[in-house]
Amino acid sequence: MWIKDVRDYIIYEDKEILVCHKPAGIAVQSAGVGNMDLESLLKNYIARKQPGKMPYLGVIHRLDQPVEGVVVFALNPKAAAALNRQMTSGQIRKTYLAVTAGDLPGKEGKLEDWLKKDGRTNTSRAVKEGTEGAKKAVLYWKLLETKETVDEMRSLLEIRLETGRHHQIRVQMANAGMPLVGDRKYNPEKTGREPLCLCSAALEIRHPMTGKKMQFQVRPAGEGFQAFDMEGYVDKK
């Protein structure tokens, strides 16, 4: 993923926070030597605005590299501390949109699993409760729209997380028989060249200084979302 001008992806900015629409294909942080990541691009942007000053950018949360969506950063340590407290206490709320392949067991539901991460393969899997190293994962999903393709039924879902585990949405949905379109890790047998259809489409926070509730939304740009009418699910951008 190549970003020509990071300013094209900035949704909101003031003296305390900076909010971006992270495109799919770029890491939020530490992508490795020679690889571009969003943190580095934004630090360069801040440095150009404030010549002679060391740029500060606090990473509050991350999205997986193939996932697009809203990401908030802090522009000073005080704002970072306030936002981190919100993250720890569950006050920062994220709403995801996803496209799944195959039939659904209903129009909405709750998934509750125990997930264990494998650091060697950078994957997670559902295991039995009580498995060493496993963590409880809970999410809620709701059907928004369905479209029938030549090969399969596809569904646009709204997903809300109660917990935040490694690859949680991707693992739980695949384990429940509702794999995400384009997921090469957890739905490889049905994945062609389509990108992963997962977007953190809405983010709600309290401003770290004023306490004002703020909500940011983005319209998914991924190919798999284009078959659906997004007008009723996110504000037009």
Question: What residue spans do the PLM features occupy?
Answer:
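RNA pseudouridine synthases
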Residues: 1-237
